[in-house]
């Protein structure tokens, strides 16, 4: 749940912080924002994140504000421990994306494609927050149950008659694409149907063409889900 800026006192009181520390936190935040920003125009987005009994404060200014400030993470000592290289234009949320028992930070974005987001993991070894490189290239990602693989979906033009889904995994805080399903139903395409490809060393190799008529494929999401769930291991093997 997001808290408005005027709710910061209540939020931090739940963490057993007094009013003086609230003022100090506000001052800490002000120091990293460009001069002239009007805090009263829109509320700030603030939430607390707990990882292994340690609490953090995630904060950024409202997406409607003309002067955008990158997302910040502070500890309860008021130290700024992470500044993200970007801004969550559609807000942020916490979720256990990789299902490892730790909450992660999703930064959602407003785009023409839809489903674009960034992801921040907490590294238990270094005790630091780290961004996942390339995550924004995989819109609307879904984890394949019982595996460490994920697949995405995005429109590719022609009123959604063309679309793509990528199979990928995350290693060392980076995303690696290993497969693609490409639906091509647009009349202007030389070939219509569903094309399945392996990605090896960032090069695409078509391995299957399921011929279909031109048009909108109503079963595309079901096809994508079933195919990746039943075939992802074939793409994981080199």
Locate predicted features.
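Beta-propeller blade termini
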Residues: 44-49, 88-97, 138-148
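Acidic, small-residue rich beta-repeat scaffolds with periodic aromatic anchors
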Residues: 16-52, 149, 153-238
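Sec-dependent N-terminal signal peptides
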Residues: 3-13
């Amino acid at each position: 749940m997001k808290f408005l800026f005027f709710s910061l006192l209540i939020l931090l009181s739940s963490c057993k912080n007094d009013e003086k520390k609230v003022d100090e936190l506000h001052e800490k935040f002000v120091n990293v924002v460009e001069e002239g920003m009007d805090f009263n125009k829109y509320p700030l987005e603030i939430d607390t994140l707990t990882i292994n009994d340690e609490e953090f404060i995630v904060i950024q200014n409202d997406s409607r504000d003309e002067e955008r400030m990158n997302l910040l993470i502070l500890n309860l000592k008021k130290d700024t421990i992470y500044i993200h290289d970007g801004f969550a234009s559609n807000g942020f949320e916490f979720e256990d994306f990789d299902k490892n028992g730790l909450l992660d930070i999703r930064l959602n974005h407003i785009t023409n494609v839809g489903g674009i987001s960034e992801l921040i993991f907490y590294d238990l070894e270094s005790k630091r927050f780290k961004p996942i490189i390339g995550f924004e290239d995989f819109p609307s990602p879904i984890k394949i149950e019982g595996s460490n693989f994920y697949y995405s979906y995005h429109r590719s033009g022609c009123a959604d008659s063309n679309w793509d889904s990528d199979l990928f995994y995350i290693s060392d805080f980076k995303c690696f694409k290993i497969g693609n399903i490409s639906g091509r139903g647009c009349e202007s395409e030389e070939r219509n149907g569903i094309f399945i490809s392996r990605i090896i060393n960032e090069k695409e190799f078509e391995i299957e063409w399921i011929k279909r008529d031109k048009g909108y494929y109503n079963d595309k999401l079901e096809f994508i889900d079933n195919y990746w769930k039943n075939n992802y291991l074939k793409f994981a093997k080199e």
